[in-house]
Curated annotation (Swiss-Prot):
Record note on quaternary structure: Homotetramer. Forms an RuvA(8)-RuvB(12)-Holliday junction (HJ) complex. HJ DNA is sandwiched between 2 RuvA tetramers; dsDNA enters through RuvA and exits via RuvB. An RuvB hexamer assembles on each DNA strand where it exits the tetramer. Each RuvB hexamer is contacted by two RuvA subunits (via domain III) on 2 adjacent RuvB subunits; this complex drives branch migration. In the full resolvosome a probable DNA-RuvA(4)-RuvB(12)-RuvC(2) complex forms which resolves the HJ.
Name assigned to this protein: Holliday junction branch migration complex subunit RuvA
Gene name of this polypeptide: ruvA
GO molecular function per UniProt: ATP binding; four-way junction DNA binding; four-way junction helicase activity
Residue ranges, annotated region (Domain III): 139-196
Naturally occurring in which organism (per UniProt): Borrelia garinii subsp. bavariensis (strain ATCC BAA-2496 / DSM 23469 / PBi) (Borreliella bavariensis)
């Protein structure tokens, strides 16, 4: 099984990235959140999942192992195929989806395109208590508490700052930044996201 792919983004499509590795070019179907994180020529590392059926072979790419595990859990739900699972992950971040499932937020989940209340109920039944997040983001935030405090002191809401900081940590998880550069990158990235 292909666990990860390291490569350079040579093409961005509507719902996929084309990566050039040392020898091959791979097209990976990705979530909208994953797609938005990269631009052409970026060097990236994506977790992968190979979906193989008799007449179908598709390679999916993910920001981290948690997003991939959420995808795998979703396709385990009767009636949810890989494209529907990717659509879910394009409409709601995997950690927010886990929270919505755990608290049985029918309204939020059923608003996802192609997921009605009946399918949302099936998801709750199948996934509740089974979506485990590795706390990668939380552990990566541990070293940036001072950064969080400094941004909050600028007058921003702590909850929003924390959320944007988690999003930005998604980016540095697979970046080639040195430790000394990460805080500076996060500071700029969080402020940029706060202003959007």
């Amino acid at each position: 099984m292909i666990n990860k792919i390291h490569g350079k983004v040579i093409e961005k499509k509507e719902s996929s990235l084309v990566l050039m590795t040392t020898v091959f070019e791979f097209e990976l179907l990705v979530s909208a959140f994953c797609l938005a994180n990269f631009k052409l020529s970026d060097k990236v590392e994506l977790f992968t999942y190979l979906y193989a059926r008799e007449n179908e072979l598709k390679l999916f790419g993910f920001l981290n192992s948690d997003e991939r595990e959420t995808f795998k859990s979703l396709i385990g739900v009767s009636g949810i195929g890989p494209r529907a699972a990717l659509r879910v992950l394009s409409n709601i971040r995997y950690n927010d989806f886990k929270e919505a499932i755990d608290r049985e937020d029918v309204e939020l989940v059923s608003k996802i395109k192609g997921i009605g209340k009946k399918m949302a109920g099936k998801m709750f039944l199948h996934l509740q208590g089974k979506l485990l997040i590795n706390n990668e983001l939380e552990s990566s935030l541990f070293g940036f508490k001072e950064l969080e405090e400094s941004i909050v002191s600028m007058g921003f809401d702590r909850k929003i700052v924390n959320s944007k900081l988690k999003e930005a940590c998604d980016l540095i998880e697979f970046s080639n930044l040195k430790d000394s550069e990460k805080e500076q990158f996060l500071f700029k990235e969080v402020l940029k996201r706060m202003s959007n």
